[in-house]
């Protein structure tokens, strides 16, 4: 029996695909739009660690689907590239002392080798790298279009600064932990700083970003997260006059029906009015409080679980309708960047206001109740009800009626107006780091921004020896005086660079025309392929990459450069592949190499105490990272591909277990060993024809729906059926090889060649069609006899008729061999039971 030499087979076919450019694709206008398919993976950033087994999960899914569609006559575009600018590459360079240009190239080569070893059907001629000049020239060009459209501006603003990373981070890059706000990458401490920043007006597109979600085939959870991040609210903006001041406080509220329950106003610690309106004898306390609160994260300040804090300014405002005096407080739970930076305190009908009022013993005045009568409140009443404690014309009404009347009164008396507000804030676009796209802007002596001419692009990132962050909030580029100062013009360059998200905002468009030096992509090519039909990647990018790229795409659409309103038609988030780790009694996880297994139990080598096996995220510190190179070396790429898809539904998280891949490896060996049987061109038995059409149907339907685990299961069942036969029937084996090929392309190509077909299977075959009528559904065992003696037993559909039963019996190989030179006297058929052939 010849051994399944997967290493040799996989190397052979990977070289064949490379040398023959099997997966290279060009635009062909004769192919109708409905037969074109653009499949995309979220491209990787090339870290020094390389891939672990979790990374290829999404790539394998798109590869299977792409190959399946290719065999179904689709014109498939499936490109790959590298998100090679940004913090991960730069941090690695700083840690190792290797220049990011060099380390990035080395890491990309490592990634490419690992990706190619898995046999993915990428068109490598379309490879892109966001750090290369021919790519970031167009990132800079798009930035200039944003600037010219008034969507990029400079602003001195409070920003999150990470001393460890040496850069400003966007709100979306901050996570809340029990130890306070941290950077999303690295979980480093952050602080608030006032710095000059480039900001993009994503808020101008808030409504469209919200509305167009309805057109997308995306997971509802992702759409809901984007809706919440954009945070649309419809309400009223109300003006409050301040006692002794000409300034006014504007408040946005979605509950104008509670206006008569206002007992205080709260303004954000960032509000510029604070110094102006605070009474002298309150100033010291107020300014101390402001300084303390500005360093907290937005999430920390607004969380319902967090203790509400505040300080009285000593000043008062006037109620816009009743003219009553209302105390003005500064409070941590109000954000200067959301709405107007001020809220009306209605403690009877808002939980945060209720907590605040209780803490500082402020008046709580209910103006809505369920019964229309005063009731004792143990918590804020936030439901609908009847108005109470209000001026006569607003009293004893449904609160919905009060809302309408208040809006009309405020509008008529010019004390307020209807308004839509969003939680979404403009995108902080500057980074004080070296390894990123230089921003193509000059400043004159007065500080006016002057965009570079388009024919001066790319503005190249200068090579420097010291690329470490300055620690002062300035970019490392600011140290290169001869680059910063444009002497012949008397201008200075912008020294901040773009964030990592810039290059990934539009990469899917560059794949369409990666070598074009005259434009970011030819318009006809964009119209040919866009939008992306299937996009697979991690859910962690919901409010970062996915929101940013939608924004840039809409700008390009408005400018007439792209033909679709949205870039990604269908999105799938693959589940996380976790790993096993080990936990001590106190809950502490210990590294895997510190654990020993005895009698199916696990023990800590250090103290010999039993530990519990748990599921945890793969991490270097826990030593539970599985390297795909090791798996491929031991079991092969096809085994790894199939195992990753067989572990469970694509969108579910699941733990990696190397023991589980052994079963998949056996499955592929079973298929390989079919070569040992005679390859017969005879007509196969009806039962195996039925099994073939059943498996084609199942694999077709499940692959179409991305239900890869159940498709693989069906193929495993089929192979066990096929192994029962003495011969390997060509008419069965050939279509099976084709349906196997998206899942195990290397083995399929080898078997395709073995049965005498021309390679590549992916260019010289078509996906087989199933015939429903050939599938035996309600099975009955039929006994085949000659002169009353049993010769065979077969399974047939219950509804098989007498004529067909006779024909099937006469075609049976065991019956045929016993009929040679014999005369048939008669054929007796008992439906759903037997066929008896009487001979002499």
Swiss-Prot record:
It is found in: Cytoplasm. InterPro entries: aa-tRNA-synth_I_CS, aa-tRNA-synth_Ia, Leu-tRNA-ligase, Leu_tRNA-synth_edit, M/V/L/I-tRNA-synth_anticd-bd, Methionyl/Leucyl_tRNA_Synth, Rossmann-like_a/b/a_fold, tRNAsynth_Ia_anticodon-bd. One of its GO terms (cellular component) is cytosol. A motif ('HIGH' region) lies at residues 44-55. This is Leucine--tRNA ligase. A motif ('KMSKS' region) lies at residues 617-621. The keyword Transmembrane helix does not apply. GO terms for biological process: leucyl-tRNA aminoacylation. Keywords: Aminoacyl-tRNA synthetase, ATP-binding, Cytoplasm, Ligase, Nucleotide-binding, Protein biosynthesis. It comes from the Bacteria. ATP binds at residue 620. The keyword Membrane does not apply. It catalyses: tRNA(Leu) + L-leucine + ATP = L-leucyl-tRNA(Leu) + AMP + diphosphate. The gene is leuS. One of its GO terms (molecular function) is ATP binding. Its EC number is 6.1.1.4. It comes from Borreliella burgdorferi (strain ZS7) (Borrelia burgdorferi). Belongs to the class-I aminoacyl-tRNA synthetase family.
